[in-house]
Amino acid sequence: MPFTLGQRWISDTESELGLGTVVAMDARTVTLLFPSTGENRLYARSDSPVTRVMFNPGDTITSHEGWQLHIDEVKEENGLLVYVGTRLDTEETNVTLREVLLDSKLVFSKPQDRLFAGQIDRMDRFALRYRARKFQSEQYRMPYSGLRGQRTNLIPHQLNIAHDVGRRHAPRVLLADEVGLGKTIEAGMILHQQLLSGAAERVLIIVPETLQHQWLVEMLRRFNLRFALFDDERYTEAQHDAYNPFETEQLVICSLDFARRNKQRLEHLCDAEWDLLVVDEAHHLVWSTDAPSREYMAIEQLAERVPGVLLLTATPEQLGMESHFARLRLLDPNRFHDFEQFVEEQKNYRPVADAVAMLLAGNKLSNDELNRLGDLIGEQDIEPLLQAANSDRDDAQAARDELVSMLMDRHGTSRVLFRNTRNGVKGFPKRELHTVKLPLPTQYQTAIKVSGIMGARKSAEDRARDMLYPEQIYQEFEGDTGTWWNFDPRVEWLMGYLTSHRSQKVLVICAKATTALQLEQVLREREGIRAAVFHEGMSIIERDRAAAWFAEEDTGAQVLLCSEIGSEGRNFQFASNLVMFDLPFNPDLLEQRIGRLDRIGQAHDIQIHVPYLEKTAQSVLVRWYHEGLDAFEHTCPTGRAIYDSAYASLINYLAAPEETDGFDDLIKSCREQHEALKAQLEQGRDRLLEIHSNGGEKAQQLAQSIEEQDDDTNLIAFAMNLFDIVGINQDDRGDNLIVLTPSDHMLVPDFPGLPEDGCTITFERDVALSREDAQFITWEHPLIRNGLDLILSGDTGSSTISLLKNKALPVGTLLVELVYVVEAQAPKQLQLNRFLPPTPVRMLLDKNGNNLAAQVEFETFNRQLSAVNRHTGSKLVNAVQQDVYAILQLGETQIEQSARALIDNARREADEKLSGELSRLEALRAVNPNIRDDELAAIDSNRQQVLESLNQAGWRLDALRLIVVTHQ
């Protein structure tokens, strides 16, 4: 190699040393000093792993003094390069900069600079980079972004609500689905979309204290959202790190009590600039015109400051009109400010609901009915649509659907309230109750007697709670020596049931964790029954493992023993047998227990087994739940109201189960109350709202489209390629499960989202739903998104050299493959990627500038190429640098047309879509006051900013590959 003192070279193997200077040489060796690190390297002159650094006109370089020069001309004097150009800080022209004075900390970021500096990547990394660009761009443009990555069944009504609300600016809605229909999942889907698109970055979830862990688990397991749980201890700890502790985390969960009981804490919450507020169990916020509760006022303060609000609540009919109005008032106080006016409005919606029922029935409409429809819709030129809807023509159904849609748009609360009922949603199993009456052992009888004497001063409620769990009473007297499981007939019955149903999965729920642990030991030691335990003393990871073991079909646990609190937020639809070893104290907890199996998507009828001891509180409660509320075999929306009204009487019967006088009358009265309330609820059903919330055929198509996207084989191929190149070990465990573990030779020390001890993944939704320890990998999973960012945010794969063996072309023929990226810079909230994501434009140029990309598809071409080692590659680049530079110049002139076309299309699409949305909502505003002014203003502002950002869009070279033809 021709070396001269003062020349600048870069090491092919140690590029982190920066720019080296030739400081000494003899006949066989050359010494380079690397000023940025102060290190010297001695190389053999004949075959040294270094590359000469040469810049070209158009490049910008930095001097050792820090000023920059835009190169206009390159000269050579005595073997040294001299750059002539314009100094950027002073705008002085014809400034010269000798290469010896270049900044030694030079970083080559442009692909062409890296190529010319000998920083040549492996060929497979270039291919990965191109695929990453291509797939990322496609995913940004895919419909239903944000709805595909969650670990949930694809349930149409949930997807419909999430798709509608998740795309809105700062959504403010009330989710009021009946129990078991998945309000938490709907809220999670909305959050996931908003966070993924950048519409929201900071989220606060406020829930009752008992549901905090349930939300934490659901958000992490289903949506890969890592929330921080704030309690008194965490709040105090965070005060050391920031004036406002809530600014230390982006995603926060706290309890309503935690938020309410401290004035400064509430102020900190209000000042933390959240984008979205989620409030679960919002029906517990008590409000009246004269005296709103402190809890309600706390949420009201937050709702005034946070742009987006999701309230999750029980069904409106259960709560009464005033309570329902109070929720809506939190969402839009300007719209819902007068309760009397609201009541009047609700009455006026009845004709609208009747009209929709008429249209959906499909019968011919009378003239009066047609006139009524015309009056309700109140639009000009509606006559042809009405005639079409009432005809036998092929378009009659489409016309009816259009009329239903127009009526829904005029429905008072359809934009702010979503409510699905079990009647309107298919897919629920039946419930079958099997009660097993068992004798009360003498040991328990004695313990109960003694307890009654000693606890005479206890309240009726405390005695009632004690009587529900006789094993606890016995254990208290006997201490550690008490072995209640040796004589309790429920244990014998359970062992008999499990041994006679060994092929079936059984979920056993009991109130206390200690009971679950003791039962596990008995089942294992006496009958060798494989039982997993699940209780609140376990970590989330331990619970995951227990759930995964229970889910395994062949080698897994037959039974899962859960405590009351431990089972919150977990669903086990793959099992259909539920054993209640004891009974919970109120109907809400009973429904929660059954709800572990009775979920939409359950494939079998649920068998509910209740072994109970006679002459105990259990025998009282089993009758009251079944005969008084019908709560075992059907969901019981009336349960809480009747429980509250019958509480005093019920407690007395539970505290003294032997006193049965009048109990039959109580059951009869509760049953009558239940039937009356149920009829009242049914009559008050808002069928129009249910149709709107359910989504009908549109929601079915949405679920089907996402299911089709689940079968994308590109994802699996790309993910495995990514893991290979990053250096992540993959161990195929069968059953569509793969274990990923970090290796010692990864591209980065820590791959974001991959735990130190690894993780189990699956690409199959069904597997992910039955195996909670397996992460469900989609294009939206953090492992894939982080992998894309890792490759594309750096220079991995941005420059490479390949050989093309092709005897039809002359040896030494050059081709240059260029990958440009067309993109626009804008704040994430604008969601510019909907219209112009970073889009790759591939060109394959010969020396004359002919673009062969259309004729030669990337993957086919890539398979024909072979790799070149870095050292040989550097020599090749040095030999053809001027030719490559000339082809690059031709590429620069050609890219503009393609890029401009992409940008113009994006502008047109953005303008049409955003202007159309604005026009539709403005027109609707005239007939539906629930469309907020701030929402319209935000859409208009968003449209202007999007179009302005697209005007500023540009393009840049992202990667290049030099291809040299060979015949060997």
Swiss-Prot record:
<dbReference type="Pfam" id="PF00176">
    <property type="entry name" value="SNF2-rel_dom"/>
</dbReference>
<dbReference type="GO" id="GO:0004386">
    <property type="term" value="F:helicase activity"/>
</dbReference>
<dbReference type="InterPro" id="IPR027417">
    <property type="entry name" value="P-loop_NTPase"/>
</dbReference>
<dbReference type="GO" id="GO:0006355">
    <property type="term" value="P:regulation of DNA-templated transcription"/>
</dbReference>
<dbReference type="InterPro" id="IPR022737">
    <property type="entry name" value="RapA_C"/>
</dbReference>
<dbReference type="InterPro" id="IPR014001">
    <property type="entry name" value="Helicase_ATP-bd"/>
</dbReference>
<dbReference type="InterPro" id="IPR023949">
    <property type="entry name" value="Helicase_RapA"/>
</dbReference>
<keyword id="KW-0804">Transcription</keyword>
<keyword id="KW-0805">Transcription regulation</keyword>
<dbReference type="InterPro" id="IPR049730">
    <property type="entry name" value="SNF2/RAD54-like_C"/>
</dbReference>
<dbReference type="InterPro" id="IPR038718">
    <property type="entry name" value="SNF2-like_sf"/>
</dbReference>
<keyword id="KW-0378">Hydrolase</keyword>
<feature type="short sequence motif" description="DEAH box">
    <location>
        <begin position="280"/>
        <end position="283"/>
    </location>
</feature>
<feature type="domain" description="Helicase C-terminal">
    <location>
        <begin position="490"/>
        <end position="685"/>
    </location>
</feature>
<comment type="subunit">
    <text>Interacts with the RNAP. Has a higher affinity for the core RNAP than for the holoenzyme. Its ATPase activity is stimulated by binding to RNAP.</text>
</comment>
<dbReference type="Pfam" id="PF18337">
    <property type="entry name" value="Tudor_RapA"/>
</dbReference>
<dbReference type="GO" id="GO:0005524">
    <property type="term" value="F:ATP binding"/>
</dbReference>
<keyword id="KW-0238">DNA-binding</keyword>
<feature type="domain" description="Helicase ATP-binding">
    <location>
        <begin position="164"/>
        <end position="334"/>
    </location>
</feature>
<dbReference type="InterPro" id="IPR001650">
    <property type="entry name" value="Helicase_C-like"/>
</dbReference>
<dbReference type="GO" id="GO:0016817">
    <property type="term" value="F:hydrolase activity, acting on acid anhydrides"/>
</dbReference>
<dbReference type="InterPro" id="IPR040765">
    <property type="entry name" value="Tudor_1_RapA"/>
</dbReference>
<keyword id="KW-0347">Helicase</keyword>
<dbReference type="GO" id="GO:0003677">
    <property type="term" value="F:DNA binding"/>
</dbReference>
<dbReference type="Pfam" id="PF12137">
    <property type="entry name" value="RapA_C"/>
</dbReference>
<keyword id="KW-0547">Nucleotide-binding</keyword>
<keyword id="KW-0010">Activator</keyword>
<dbReference type="Pfam" id="PF00271">
    <property type="entry name" value="Helicase_C"/>
</dbReference>
<comment type="similarity">
    <text>Belongs to the SNF2/RAD54 helicase family. RapA subfamily.</text>
</comment>
<dbReference type="Pfam" id="PF18339">
    <property type="entry name" value="Tudor_1_RapA"/>
</dbReference>
<keyword id="KW-0067">ATP-binding</keyword>
<dbReference type="InterPro" id="IPR000330">
    <property type="entry name" value="SNF2_N"/>
</dbReference>
<dbReference type="InterPro" id="IPR040766">
    <property type="entry name" value="Tudor_2_RapA"/>
</dbReference>
<comment type="function">
    <text>Transcription regulator that activates transcription by stimulating RNA polymerase (RNAP) recycling in case of stress conditions such as supercoiled DNA or high salt concentrations. Probably acts by releasing the RNAP, when it is trapped or immobilized on tightly supercoiled DNA. Does not activate transcription on linear DNA. Probably not involved in DNA repair.</text>
</comment>
<protein>
    <recommendedName>
        <fullName>RNA polymerase-associated protein RapA</fullName>
        <ecNumber>3.6.4.-</ecNumber>
    </recommendedName>
</protein>
<feature type="binding site">
    <location>
        <begin position="177"/>
        <end position="184"/>
    </location>
    <ligand>
        <name>ATP</name>
    </ligand>
</feature>
